[in-house]
Amino acid sequence: MIQRVYEQVSKVLQDVYVATDDQRIYEAVEAFGGKAIMTSPNHKSGTDRIQEAYTKIGKPFDVVINIQGDEPFIHESQIETVCRCFDDDNTMIATLGRPFNDSHTFADLENPNSPKVVCDNRGFAMYFSRSVIPYLRGTDKTEWLSSFPYLKHIGLYAYRTRVLQEITALPQSPLEVYY
């Protein structure tokens, strides 16, 4: 799976690294010719792991993109979309969500392994949850997917490097502990 993700990402980005704390993953990446960075097993978040990897790489990038290794169906267009967000100098962090569609069921929506994102009217993420958000009071659950444009969060995060450094220096919030 990691090779598939690596190959998909490499179609769009030049400098691709796998940040891992697992020697087996490191060796697997090197075996298929990829670049891997060993990181501490003690990170509290993937964002902290990415910051460590960025520091170890030692190259000056303006933007760092974290794509989860368990996203084998990531599309080139999704990576390009998140990259274009940074054409605006005011963009500091970007991520993506995709709509739950007609093929999804309420069980898909309830699945805690499928994080949801709620956005404001401008499309800016306000909140992420493994629970169904928002709760549609007064609407039968069988109608929720057709009544609200629920978004599934895609495991892709991008940061301006200075913001990545700033947020990883902050203490962990209570919501991060439980999310």
Language model: regions and residue ranges:
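Short, high-confidence coil segments that cap the C-terminus of an alpha-helix
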Residues: L13, K59-F61, D88-I93
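Short phosphate-binding loop-to-helix
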Residues: Y17, Q23-T81
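Donor nucleotide-sugar recognition loop
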Residues: P171-Y179
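N-terminal glycine-rich phosphate-binding loop and ensuing alpha1 helix
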Residues: M1-T20
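A conserved hydrophobic position in a structured secondary element of the catalytic/binding core
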Residues: T20-D21, I74, Y159, Y178
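Conserved core of the sugar-phosphate nucleotidyltransferase
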Residues: E76-L170
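Hydrophobic/aromatic residues located in beta-strands of well-ordered beta-sheets
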Residues: V16-V18, V64, A94, A125
